[in-house]
Amino acid sequence: MEKLLKILIIDDEEPILSNLCSFLNYKNFDVTSASDGLEGLKLFEKDPKGFDLIITDIVMPKLSGMSLISIIKKKSPNTPIIAITGWGEYPEALALESQADKVFSKPFELSELDKTINELISSKKQKVQD
């Protein structure tokens, strides 16, 4: 049996967090969630290589998504990160600034998120093999 890929989702908006968790569980991912940046960082630090991908909101209490991404990328540069934001008119610029691999502006289509997750995980596997 193939190992389930592990995804950490961090968002302070409970309906979004719940919907993302439900969707990704349905897609057979092993999902861990946090409701703020600090909680997400603690979960990441327990096992820095334990997550195949991280999805985080940008604007959150206790620790912003931008700060969280910076910390994670220093400790685990090959872990793909998707940032989600309600503020993003220019998601490409935000991706560069935040070091996220991809940025989605809310609202977004779950099918697009699913496609991006699969692309980023495939790319990560390819880098590991090279």
Q: What are the language-model segments listed below?
A:
Residues D11, D57:
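Active-site residues of response regulator receiver
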Residues S35-E39, S64-S67:
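Acidic catalytic/metal-coordinating carboxylates
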Residues F108-E119, K125:
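C-terminal output helix
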Residues S67, W87-F104, S111, K115:
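Alpha4 helix (beta4-alpha4-beta5 surface) of REC/receiver domains from two-component response regulators
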Residues M60:
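Receiver (REC) domain active-site loop signature in two-component systems and cognate sites
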Residues K42, M66-N78:
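Short amphipathic alpha-helix used as the core "switch/output" element in two-component signaling
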Residues E14-T32:
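Two-component/phosphorelay signaling modules centered on CheY-like receiver
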